[in-house]
Amino acid sequence: MTRLSPRARRALRELRAKGSKRSIEGMARYGIRPKLAYGVPAPAVRALARKLGRDHALALEFRESGVFEARALAALVEDPKALTSSEMERWVREFESWADCDSTCLSLFWKAPFAFEKARAWAKRGPEIQRRAGFALMAALAVHDKGAQDRQFLRFLPLLEAAATDERNLIKKAVNWSIRQVGKRNGRLNREAVHAAHRIAKLPSPSARWIASDALRELESPQVKARLKKRG
């Protein structure tokens, strides 16, 4: 690890002071077992991020530290306009758990100018966390990128169908999450996501059947239909 700046060291000391062994044990119960963690609650990490503000160089130092909470902090203080494609690739290879992956996609990666490109590329990867990142990023884009065109999300559907037979738990849940979020954007995408889910349901795979049934339960529900109709 390279030598950290005084500002980064102060932030890490503050994080460590807010950590607890009990929180680390709680993380483990959810399958979050990073190599190095302080056990800092998420609200405390977010509060520190607000105090620090956007800082690309500082974000890179936090990632370099290897500390789980510092890496979460990096995603919150990083400037998405300064984030490069190669840095995103490095980050996705360093993810240690679904929590690190999902929080980074939801708080940072979807804002990157090449987010759609990365989502499609990562969805074809082999390693479980990297592939999950592709689908987590799709879900984040579907929820947060209000200006994105339908065609960008339609390109996700074949990738979701292709991954539906991946029986790994983190992939199965991420594919389901993504198809549900895409299908809740508007009426057109709802229809296309429902069609995709019906195709997935016919695949000879327990994972595919679960993904389809759970997604259709929500996407065809009266509540979702009414909400989409109200949007027009």
Language model region names:
Residues 1-232:
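Alpha-helical scaffold domains
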